[in-house]
């Protein structure tokens, strides 16, 4: 359940920005304080391991278990007869700092062949320094590659609540890091959702988290790049 602070923040956001911009903040508010709950790890027998490290956009926040984009990924792998297994280590509320602190143990435990990094939204929600977000994502990418994994960065975009320069620089972090670290990239995780003709229909009642019907589109945004990393 959201805290009173979070509810007030959402209400204030709706008054301060256009409806579409508020929906584009989904990537940020998706990991609101008080929504900490790691999803169970799912792993089929055999094949490479795909480790997903994300926030509530990947942790099925507000969704029935098994309906999020990560469980849909497992079904996609099965339908294409890919033997890869999926470990979802996403936590609602996580930041790049939290992900960076958790990653070494996850790499040691699961020894993934592919690491999907879906973090950064909460950093922008809090207006954290962009250089810190960049350092954390770069360090996570480097650590995963050093452990022998291929990395997929999942990019986000935000409305200019902290100024257009901040929003542009934040969006630019993901391609910048991907290029520097030679990692794969999903340019915008919520493409076709936050920028849809009727974005309200793509979100849960809170108008923050993508609904069950949007999960397939989220997977569709990730799958083309992820598929290239699978052997």
Model-derived regions: residue spans:
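Bacterial N-terminal signal peptides
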Residues: 16-34
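Alpha-helix N-cap/loop-to-helix initiation residues
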Residues: 59, 95-96, 126
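Serine-esterase "nucleophile elbow" of acetyl-processing enzymes
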Residues: 38-92, 102-111
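N-terminal secretory signal peptides that target proteins for export/translocation
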Residues: 1-15
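Alpha-helical cap/lid subdomain in secreted, periplasmic
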Residues: 2-5, 82, 100-231
